[in-house]
Design a protein with these regions (language model features):
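Phosphate-coordination loops involved in phosphoryl transfer and adenosine-cofactor binding
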Residues: 1-3, 89, 140
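NAD(P)+-binding Rossmann beta1-loop-alpha1 motif at the extreme N-terminus of oxidoreductases
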Residues: 1-65
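Residues at the starts of beta-strands that form the adenosine-phosphate
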Residues: 3, 27-29, 115, 142, ...
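Short beta->alpha hinge that forms the Motif I/post-I loop of the SAM-binding pocket
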Residues: 35, 70, 95
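Rossmann-like NAD(P)-binding element
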Residues: 56-91
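Rossmann-like NAD(P)(H) cofactor-binding subdomain of soluble oxidoreductases
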Residues: 78-131
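Internal alpha-helical scaffold of NAD(P)-dependent oxidoreductase catalytic cores
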Residues: 137-222
Length: 223
């Protein structure tokens, strides 16, 4: 039985749990951790995890694979806190949208014996939280994988197979290439969307302008 740990039980972490449990329920045991106890409780109730761990050390105890599904800013603290509690053969991966900095943190904080594979599923919603998590979120999407130094073929194959079980298509990239490509197709559109809405909302005529906004404006500013 594969033992999976999911740290962070929002949209992405919850959807990973739901997708894996749906695809491999009989051969998988999922432990989850969320700083918000209500999110952890709902993840259990929704079937995204089998058990909610009370803390980070408990979350990774005995894990074969640990997914870190938090904002990048939270990762240094998480990596420091789990480093001494990881099983020797545990593979650690993440879901952050940038990889160069994350790979640097992993090398800095994780034991040399730990295999870290950067991950980034190209999927999401404009809403967040465990309540909007869904098993089909990753179906048909590209799942970027960035092997770390010394990543074994077996570890990369394990994470690739889990991504495929979620319905995604694994794509192996180098960290720098990932960040440059994603900046153009994900980060830039988000920036443009935010800038457009902020500019329009700041106009004195926004109350009237908003009544004229139709599907085109909604589509562009959805992000």
């Amino acid at each position: 039985m594969t033992r999976v740990s999911i740290i962070g039980l929002g949209l992405i972490g919850g959807s990973i749990g739901l997708a894996l449990k749906q695809a491999k329920s009989s051969s998988l045991r999922v432990t989850g951790f969320a700083r918000n106890p209500n999110a952890a409780r709902r993840a259990c109730e929704r079937g995204a995890v089998d058990i909610a761990a009370p803390d980070l050390p408990s979350a990774v105890a005995g894990a074969d694979v640990a997914f870190i599904c938090t904002p990048p800013s939270a990762m240094p603290d998480i990596l420091r806190n789990i480093a001494s509690h990881l099983p020797p053969k545990c593979v650690v991966t993440d879901t952050a949208s940038t990889k160069v900095q994350v790979m640097t943190w992993a090398k800095q904080w994780l034991p040399a014996t730990t295999q870290f594979i950067g991950g980034h599923p190209m999927a999401g919603k404009e809403t967040t939280g465990i309540e909007v998590a869904e098993a089909g979120l990753f179906r048909g999407c590209t799942y970027c994988l960035v092997p770390g130094e010394g990543t074994s073929e077996a570890s990369l194959r394990l994470v690739s197979e889990l991504a495929e079980a979620m319905g995604a298509r694994p794509l192996v990239l180098e960290a720098q290439a990932h960040d440059e490509l994603v900046a153009g197709v994900s980060h830039l559109p988000t920036l443009v969307s935010t800038a457009l809405f902020a500019t329009a909302e700041g106009k004195d005529a926004w109350p009237l302008m908003s009544q004229l906004a139709a599907s085109g404006f909604r589509d562009v500013t959805r992000l």
